[in-house]
Amino acid sequence: MEDDSLYLGGEWQFNHFSKLTSSRPDAAFAEIQRTSLPEKSPLSCETRVDLCDDLAPVARQLAPREKLPLSSRRPAAVGAGLQNMGNTCYVNASLQCLTYTPPLANYMLSREHSQTCHRHKGCMLCTMQAHITRALHNPGHVIQPSQALAAGFHRGKQEDAHEFLMFTVDAMKKACLPGHKQVDHHSKDTTLIHQIFGGYWRSQIKCLHCHGISDTFDPYLDIALDIQAAQSVQQALEQLVKPEELNGENAYHCGVCLQRAPASKTLTLHTSAKVLILVLKRFSDVTGNKIAKNVQYPECLDMQPYMSQTNTGPLVYVLYAVLVHAGWSCHNGHYFSYVKAQEGQWYKMDDAEVTASSITSVLSQQAYVLFYIQKSEWERHSESVSRGREPRALGAEDTDRRATQGELKRDHPCLQAPELDEHLVERATQESTLDHWKFLQEQNKTKPEFNVRKVEGTLPPDVLVIHQSKYKCGMKNHHPEQQSSLLNLSSTTPTHQESMNTGTLASLRGRARRSKGKNKHSKRALLVCQ
């Protein structure tokens, strides 16, 4: 089966000897093995072009860098709230963060894609273009997200917001690809979506015996941070790039001296993304329990200390969106987000409710996903704000007015019984599905040597399993936590603190978290000699 995974790929290997040869021109990564070189010695001209510009030869540039809109088309004020259709708070929170991503929003508002798209249905870029346009051009209103945005993913119960976020980003990246033509793996990393969210890791292993160096470059769309021992995002990043010693049973098999030897392994960011998605690993891979600790994150983040080249000056990112989970485990809870409108004002986006907020409140949340944009990018997009509407803050008056229009339901929508629409059930008609996406990722990631724990959950006989979790929740029938998460339609209107998005079967099956900060891919080898 052809690998259609959107941010998976192969591996490039270079060995510097005496003559340049190439056997796999369609690979997506680069590994360089060379003998000891001075720390700042330049590589050959051919290698410098491959590594510094595109890391590997590109057969086809799918989205030229100049195609990104240079000026902002976004209204200055905040846009619409999103109606909760029943356990869809994770969808709404993720969509709001994407809607207020400046380069993505500006491209969508330019309508460039829809004018040239030849796909008749199932195009996530066209769907997102319609959604972002409606959301930004309807301030003070509540709109209903298109069912096509969650088709193949949402099945009436609580899901993981980060998984849905990356599912959507991957679907948009896939929509950039010419479906009727074969595209090499590295060309897939030249799409407009990768230009916005993507970058490259650099994993460097230095043999301590012969001082030979091996560099491997892997693409990324988001960065997962372990927060178990970290009190701040900066500490988590420092742990991520901390050198690792390889010795003893874990000694490195050097490709230069051709023997097992102690080595030092260092992971750094080789190229920086315009938009940085940092996911804080708050949920246990086994139980799904939440790490409910405060992790500090700054409004301005300097990523230069974590780059391969650390002597090029500050690389400042500014915070523009925060995705928050309120609850005790991945099986239940409620998602909402904070976004920064182009006018510079922060807003809390809690389904249909849109209220003005402050940076102090934003920085005090137990964040799940953080969205940063390069400061130069933010300033460039902010210099040409559309003057069509005056900035204004939405407060209680706007919320009350929306409620009188019948847009808000009496009970919190997260606690209402979901109604599966026929459009969502007809999974076969959708081009991207969660199962297909997970299958492709599983095929291309490094397999663990053993499973720490595998627990089967028991589902009621009348439940249709549309997609399954990577790990099982492990709850038996009539488990107390399971009972507490079942719907109680006769309950009164919950308070804000009680409005947790439990869902019908929210405690039955969990959602797995990627356990690594980067996405490992199936390896492809290319031998280059000179």
Curated annotation (Swiss-Prot):
Belongs to the peptidase C19 family. USP17 subfamily. Residues 382-392, 398-413 have a biased composition (Basic and acidic residues). It catalyses: Thiol-dependent hydrolysis of ester, thioester, amide, peptide and isopeptide bonds formed by the C-terminal Gly of ubiquitin (a 76-residue protein attached to proteins as an intracellular targeting signal). Keywords: Endoplasmic reticulum, Hydrolase, Nucleus, Protease, Thiol protease, Ubl conjugation pathway. It comes from the Eukaryota. It comes from Homo sapiens (Human). GO terms for cellular component: cytosol; endoplasmic reticulum; nucleus. The gene is USP17L11. This is Ubiquitin carboxyl-terminal hydrolase 17-like protein 11.
